[in-house]
């Protein structure tokens, strides 16, 4: 065989092996995912009342959506919860909207330049410090030690299932668990593009994440 024949031969078999590995890995994830789900169904629901649920909502110019976001989180079924909105240097009416919907369950962390608008990670880190130093020091929350405080990160346009704490809390009964990734759905699947995006999240969460959970190797995703 000539040089080009050998090159085509190598490319063909490398591609064949890669495809075979991909299909095999998909089947393995499907099998392990089903085993994990069966094991999970046998696990009793957790007691969400044991925990303080702290929902962190990064917000930059979310004046149109932030009131609805807070209302949705207020509808989440958690006995002990606090909603922390991080107003990350907004120059619209986000701050005014938050002032109008205040309550004992809502805390607002207002960031201003030069610290504001330095990225979502920086905003969340500031919120963690704010919760630790100020919120957990309040008499209403001093009964919760750090092992019984669960942070939930929710985008301003996100929707968390009302019964999520009941399902999530059972995972934290295992002290080796440090975080839980919930399944993500696209709720406005009104176009072909958003429908395909929803399918992507379904495959990623329902196959890859669940399959990896069997070995305890699932990871936290986000933007």
Can you say where each PLM-predicted feature lies in the sequence?
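Short aromatic/hydrophobic "clamp" motif used to bind/position activated sugar donors
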Residues: 151
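Long helical/loop segments within the catalytic core of UDP-sugar-dependent glycosyltransferases
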Residues: 110-113, 117-146, 162-223
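N-terminal membrane-anchoring/stem segments of glycan-assembly enzymes
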Residues: 1-49, 209
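Short, acidic, metal-binding catalytic loop of nucleotide-sugar glycosyltransferases
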Residues: 71-80
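Acidic helix N-cap motif at the loop->helix transition within catalytic regions
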Residues: 67, 92-100, 120, 163
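Donor nucleotide-sugar binding loop of glycosyltransferases
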Residues: 62-65, 90
């Amino acid at each position: 065989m000539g040089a080009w024949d050998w090159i085509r031969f190598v490319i063909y078999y490398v591609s064949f092996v890669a495809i075979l590995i991909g299909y095999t890995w998909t089947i393995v994830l499907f099998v392990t995912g089903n085993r994990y789900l069966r094991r999970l169904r046998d696990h009793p629901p957790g007691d969400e009342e044991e925990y303080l649920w702290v929902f962190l909502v990064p917000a930059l110019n979310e004046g149109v959506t932030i009131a609805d976001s807070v209302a949705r989180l207020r509808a989440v079924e958690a006995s002990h919860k606090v909603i922390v909105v991080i107003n990350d240097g907004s120059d619209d009416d986000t701050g005014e909207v938050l002032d109008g919907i205040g309550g004992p369950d809502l805390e607002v962390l207002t960031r201003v330049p030069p610290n504001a608008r330095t990225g979502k990670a920086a905003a969340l880190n500031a919120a963690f410090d704010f919760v630790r130093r100020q919120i957990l020091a309040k008499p209403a929350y001093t009964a919760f030690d750090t092992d019984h405080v669960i942070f939930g990160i929710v985008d301003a346009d996100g929707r968390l299932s009302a019964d999520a704490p009941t399902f999530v809390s059972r995972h934290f009964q295992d002290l080796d668990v440090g975080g839980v990734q919930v399944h993500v759905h696209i709720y406005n699947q009104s176009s072909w593009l958003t429908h395909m995006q929803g399918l992507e999240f379904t495959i990623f969460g329902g196959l890859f994440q669940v399959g990896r959970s069997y070995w305890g190797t699932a990871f936290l995703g986000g933007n």
